[in-house]
Amino acid sequence: MPTLEVNGVRLYYELHGPEIAPVLVLNNGLIMSAASSWVFQTAALSKDYRLLLYDCRGQGQSDHPEGAYSMELHADDLAALLEALDIDRAHIAGISYGGEIAQVFALNYPQKTRSLILIDTVSEVDESLRLVIQSWVDCVEAENAVAFFNASVPWNFSPRWIEANAAVLEDAKERYKLLDFPAVKRLCEAFFKVNYTSRLEEIDDPTCIMVGELDLIKGPRFAKIIHRAIPHAEYHLIKGAGHASCWEKPEEFNAIILDFLAKQP
């Protein structure tokens, strides 16, 4: 299990693909993990790119330290991880929570960012979104895995995907029981502080915005806010996909990323 201690935290990471290829970092969603969440992307994206998957602090196989988390702290952790791996610059991608980390990384570490890919993510938290995540926090505080599963799944996947993937979701329900609930709460509390729309005009890097058409939680209305703030960005609507577009429409998801990266110097 490869780990490195950086910025006071031990982070789990994986590297895939040619050692001399440009590096592409994938930042996970809130309760995703590097070891299992990118199963539909790893092979396709690592053919021509050095793919870096990792768990941020509080996630998966990385340390889950006590104390407050923030997107700024996650960005600092990622910068330290890249430095430890002797990676000067990278394409930075992130889905959902990982997209919020990616925004802050691009803002705070522009010299380390080759391009930016923001997927099913937000740059601000309005009251309706806050209430959804607060309902998750309520489940987490009660350490009720089944309630957390039931509260989150309808927001994370489209109805059609849920109907077609009962077995996959049953397995996922079991994994919810293994979550570190205090760490998940700290991640949610970090999310509540997201408020970067006014700074996005500072981003000069080539940017690609992707969003599932049926994403109910961080959908097109939030993606359009980001696109208005970064007018040079590409905008891609993934039709028929919910929030977890990397699982629901993996071929289109991968194709958009590869096409975007192919345009970069």
Each predicted region: which residue ranges?
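Catalytic active-site module of serine/aspartate enzymes centered on a nucleophile-bearing elbow/loop
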Residues: 233-265
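Short beta-strand/loop motif that positions the catalytic acidic residue
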Residues: 203, 209-211
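Conserved alpha/beta-hydrolase catalytic His-Asp/Glu region
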Residues: 127-131, 145-201
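Short alpha-helix in the alpha/beta-hydrolase fold that links the catalytic acid
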Residues: 205, 219-226
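Flexible "cap/lid" loop of the alpha/beta hydrolase fold
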Residues: 100-108, 113-143
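Active-site loop/oxyanion-hole signature of alpha/beta-hydrolase fold enzymes
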Residues: 39, 43, 52-93, 255
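Conserved HGGG/HGGXW glycine-rich cap/lid loop of the alpha/beta-hydrolase fold
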Residues: 7-63
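Acidic catalytic loop of the alpha/beta-hydrolase fold
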Residues: 213-218
